[in-house]
Regions:
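A short, hydrophobic C-terminal helix/tail in secreted or cell-surface proteins
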Residues: 220-238
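Cleaved targeting-peptide boundary
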Residues: 19-26
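Low-complexity, serine/threonine/proline/glycine-rich extracellular segments that form mucin-like
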Residues: 29-144
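Ser/Thr/Pro-rich, low-complexity mucin-like regions
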Residues: 29-38, 46-52, 152-215
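Positively charged n-region of N-terminal signal peptides that target proteins for export
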Residues: 1-4, 235-239
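Short helix-loop boundary/capping segments
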Residues: 121-176
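Hydrophobic helical h-region of N-terminal Sec-dependent signal peptides
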Residues: 6-10, 224
Length: 239
């Protein structure tokens, strides 16, 4: 089952430039691997300008009750030396450069990026927010994003370290004419609905000033996905 949901969002700032990030969008797909039933959630920044360019995202955080558990439980199947392509919730990395095979690993791996393909040439990097703050099992440390969980400090972010390569621009393959991928989250099929907030920095790709957008996106439980579909609140993905 695959569906697309439009996240509730609030525009944090605008300018005279034509670039507008209108919302976070989520594509959900049921998959199975290594005996595990999972839901793959792909999160995209959706724009309305022909050259809109995503630069970075930050202030990632869970919203609502039970959120302490929402920083963990992600599946990884990356090709890092501490994971080796084994599906795991204990070991993994969020670095897109280490995702591995486009068929054997990528469809079942959690990773973060600013557009482009999750491959060795991707120029997305973790910002310093991964190195400190947070509490309990999800505290930040010097390992950065080389971990299976997420830091719960409310400032978590990542960025394109080489903006001139236009990796974060709409229409630059594999980005579509309106969307730039910012992450893929793999969760067990029985998980509870999770809501996250995220802020983006972007411009119109043509010399415009940097603008900022803050909004929420939802990773719904499988039952919620089905109910939304019956209510006509989801649509089939064209991706």
């Amino acid at each position: 089952m695959k569906s697309v949901m439009i996240a509730a969002a609030t525009l944090a700032a605008t300018s005279a430039a034509s670039a507008t990030l209108t919302q976070w969008s989520v594509v959900s797909t049921a998959v199975s691997n290594s005996g595990q039933n999972m839901i793959r959630y792909e999160v995209f920044a959706t724009f309305n300008g022909a050259t809109d360019t995503l630069l970075n995202v930050f202030n990632f955080g869970a919203v609502g009750s039970g959120q302490q558990d929402w920083y963990g439980g992600f599946w990884h199947k990356d090709n890092s030396d501490y994971n080796g392509g084994v599906l795991s919730q204990t070991y993994g990395t969020w670095a897109p450069q280490l995702t591995g095979s486009a068929t054997a690993n990528r469809p079942f791996d959690s990773f973060l990026l600013i557009g482009g393909n999750p491959a060795g040439t991707n120029s997305s990097n973790a910002d310093p927010s991964w190195n400190s703050g947070g509490t309990g099992a999800h505290v930040g440390s010097s390992i950065g994003w080389s971990r299976a969980d997420l830091v719960n400090n409310g400032t978590l972010g990542w960025f394109n370290s080489s903006p001139p390569n236009l990796q974060g621009r709409v229409g630059t393959a594999p980005n579509t004419a309106t969307q730039v991928k910012v992450g893929q989250f793999m969760l067990s099929a029985g998980h509870e609905t999770r809501t996250y907030t995220l802020t983006a920095g972007y411009n119109n790709g043509a010399g415009g000033s940097v603008q900022f957008f803050t909004g929420t996106f939802v990773l719904p439980a499988p039952g919620a996905i089905a109910l939304l579909g019956l209510a006509g609140l989801t649509r089939r993905s064209r991706r």
